[in-house]
Regions:
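Shared catalytic-loop signature of beta/alpha-barrel
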Residues: 1-70
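C-terminal extensions of enzymes
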Residues: 53-101
Length: 101
């Protein structure tokens, strides 16, 4: 998760080491990782699979990559991505709701 990643990055920084973030094969999670990468002083690179079309689940659209291969952090609300709820529903195998009292 984000908290654990930040702890690892800060530990690496305390030893003068870089902490590079790898891809997740789900571009919505990669968008979260992109935000985390930008919050880490000792992160210089962001690994991302291309072509992206095979790794779009569960997000609508692709991450903004320019002609130099640089990804820009979206400035939309939240993490900047939109979930594809129709795709999620088509791939859901069950629904379970738990009522908490």
């Amino acid at each position: 998760g984000v908290t654990g990643t930040l702890k690892i990055a800060h530990l690496a920084e305390s030893f003068g080491m870089q902490c590079e973030i790898h891809t997740t094969t789900m571009n919505y999670m990669d968008l979260v990782n992109l935000h985390v990468s930008c919050a880490i002083r000792n992160c210089r690179y962001f690994e991302y699979f291309v072509p992206e079309e095979d790794f779009m689940f569960p997000m609508k659209g692709l991450l903004p990559i320019d002609e130099k291969g640089i990804i820009t952090v979206p400035d939309k609300p939240g993490i900047g991505g939109e979930l594809d709820w129709e795709l999620i529903e088509r791939n859901c195998v069950s629904h379970q709701m738990e009522v908490l009292e």
